[in-house]
Amino acid sequence: MAYPLLCHYIKAPHSSFPLIPHTSHYILQLVYLHLFHPLPCTQHSHQTMKIEGRRGQMGRLNRAFREKRARFYIFRRCVIMLLRWSD
């Protein structure tokens, strides 16, 4: 997953001021680029996060469904075994 801040740094070298290597200025400039120069890269990362969230939710639902199905199968087999045993 690409980080939006890194993506802005890579795709937006056209900033109105040069990046200063000093850490605090560098971070402030990256934050400025991130906030005031929106690029499709951030939209892509937000969409990716939404899709991953949906996948996680679907994974939990599928896991719960499989567990219920397995329990029902065991219950059904036990009932059949008891019915045949009583004959």
Curated annotation (Swiss-Prot):
Its main location: membrane. GO terms for cellular component: plasma membrane. Pfam families: DVL. InterPro entries: DVL, DVL_RTFL_regulatory. Residues 56-87 are annotated as: Required for DVL/RTFL small polypeptide activity. Disruption phenotype: No visible phenotype. It is a single-pass membrane protein. Keywords: Cell membrane, Developmental protein, Membrane, Transmembrane, Transmembrane helix. It is found in: Cell membrane. The chain crosses the membrane at residues 19-35. GO terms for biological process: negative regulation of cell population proliferation; shoot system development. PANTHER family: DVL19-RELATED-RELATED. Small polypeptide acting as a regulatory molecule which coordinates cellular responses required for differentiation, growth and development, probably by restricting polar cell proliferation in lateral organs. Belongs to the DVL/RTFL small polypeptides family. This is Small polypeptide ROTUNDIFOLIA LIKE 2. It comes from Oryza sativa subsp. japonica (Rice). The gene is RTFL2.
